[in-house]
């Protein structure tokens, strides 16, 4: 189903064209920026057949938009495949989760999954459907608030429910006549190369990334699968300590332990944090929000750690044990204070 370009979308593409004219053709890093690629992707998906003078012009426009989105001169075959998979993955997410993930600007499918896994951990319901009670809705509303959009319905699932095509099934097709004139003027301003030239250019660039080997198809597929699996296990390595990670986002967080970088800063008091989840927990100190409730006595807590420590009062659990005398404690701080007794005795 095709949809006509909205006025806001046309404005975004016009901005891109103006920037290209201003900066010239040698600014490849700017052209490969995630923001610009996302705008081209949106226009590639939303281009309506009625907006083009004819079938060849429509195909040419699609080739140009697709090339600007996937940037074969900047990306390998694997990276282009990842961009396509990332787009489809985002499209099958519920709208609330889709907006949440897009706000973090993931560049790969793995980064998108990491954003969702972080959200699962913060909601303390990993791998399960988030309950629709008011308490959970308030928590998620706080997380979605920075997006600056109204979210009236927050029945969120962390697993796929309906694809975008299923959600749009049965809806009448929109008429693109209103935007046809604007789009014709927009694309006629540029001299678009012929579609055959696009095809040859992209094929040449893609084939250049993968050398040909005189091996059988089965051997190549098996070797490629084995190398891919090994790369996926530990493909991101820290240059400082040699520790490896499966996801680039985990490596980025780890590097901050070496650099001391704390990019997440509290607007209220200025305190900085290494991870975004730590800042979210800290914000509750200022807002007074206590989303964690003890089922035994009903006491509320601002953080999950405080609730866990409190619940040990009811269960009698004392997981922290002194190595010197074997005495157990409910919280680690009590164990640390106790260990000073042994340290003082040794000194005297």
Curated annotation (Swiss-Prot):
It is found in: Nucleus. One of its GO terms (molecular function) is RNA polymerase II cis-regulatory region sequence-specific DNA binding. The keyword rRNA-binding does not apply. Residues 41-123 form the SCAN box domain. Its main location: nucleus. Gene3D superfamilies: Classic Zinc Finger (3.30.160.60), DNA breaking-rejoining enzymes (1.10.4020.10). Transmembrane segments: none annotated. Keywords: DNA-binding, Metal-binding, Nucleus, Repeat, Transcription, Transcription regulation, Zinc, Zinc-finger. Pfam families: SCAN, zf-C2H2. GO terms for cellular component: nucleus. SUPFAM superfamilies: beta-beta-alpha zinc fingers (SSF57667), Retrovirus capsid dimerization domain-like (SSF47353). The keyword Metal-binding applies. A zinc finger (C2H2-type) spans 236-258, 264-286, 292-314, 320-342. GO terms for biological process: regulation of transcription by RNA polymerase II. Residues 160-184, 205-226 are annotated as: Disordered. Residues 163-184 have a biased composition (Basic and acidic residues). Belongs to the krueppel C2H2-type zinc-finger protein family. May be involved in transcriptional regulation. This is Zinc finger and SCAN domain-containing protein 16. It comes from Homo sapiens. The lineage of its organism: Eukaryota, Metazoa, Chordata, Craniata, Vertebrata. The gene is ZSCAN16.
């Amino acid at each position: 189903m095709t949809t006509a370009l909205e006025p806001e979308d046309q404005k975004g593409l016009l901005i891109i064209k103006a920037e290209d004219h201003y900066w010239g053709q040698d600014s490849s890093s700017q052209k490969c920026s995630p923001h610009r690629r996302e705008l081209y992707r949106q226009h590639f998906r939303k281009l309506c057949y009625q907006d083009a003078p004819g079938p060849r012009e429509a195909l040419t426009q699609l080739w140009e938009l697709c090339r600007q989105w996937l940037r074969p001169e900047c990306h390998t075959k694997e990276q282009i495949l990842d961009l396509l998979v990332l787009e489809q993955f985002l499209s099958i997410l519920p709208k609330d989760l889709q907006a949440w993930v897009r706000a973090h600007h993931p560049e790969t499918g793995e980064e998108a999954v990491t954003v969702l896994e972080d959200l699962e951990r913060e909601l303390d319901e990993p791998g399960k459907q988030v309950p629709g009670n008011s308490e959970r809705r308030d928590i998620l509303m706080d997380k979605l608030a920075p997006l600056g959009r109204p979210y009236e319905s927050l029945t969120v699932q962390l697993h796929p429910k309906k694809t975008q095509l299923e959600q749009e099934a049965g809806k009448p097709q929109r008429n693109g006549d209103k935007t046809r004139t604007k789009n014709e003027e927009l694309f006629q301003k540029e001299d678009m190369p012929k579609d055959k030239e696009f095809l040859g250019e992209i094929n040449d660039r893609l084939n250049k990334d993968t050398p040909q080997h005189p091996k059988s198809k089965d051997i190549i597929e098996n070797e490629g699968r084995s190398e891919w699996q090994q790369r996926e296990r530990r493909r991101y390595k820290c240059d400082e300590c040699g520790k490896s990670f499966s996801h680039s986002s985990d490596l980025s967080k780890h590097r901050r332990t070496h650099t001391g970088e704390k990019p997440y800063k509290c607007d209220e008091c200025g305190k900085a944090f290494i991870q975004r989840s730590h800042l979210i927990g800290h914000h509750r100190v200022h807002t007074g929000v206590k989303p964690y409730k003890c089922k035994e006595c009903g006491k509320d807590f601002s953080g999950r750690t405080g609730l866990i420590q409190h619940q040990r009062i009811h269960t009698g659990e004392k997981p922290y044990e002194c190595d010197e005398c074997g005495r157990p404690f409910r919280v680690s701080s009590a164990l640390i204070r106790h260990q000073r007794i042994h340290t003082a005795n040794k000194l005297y």
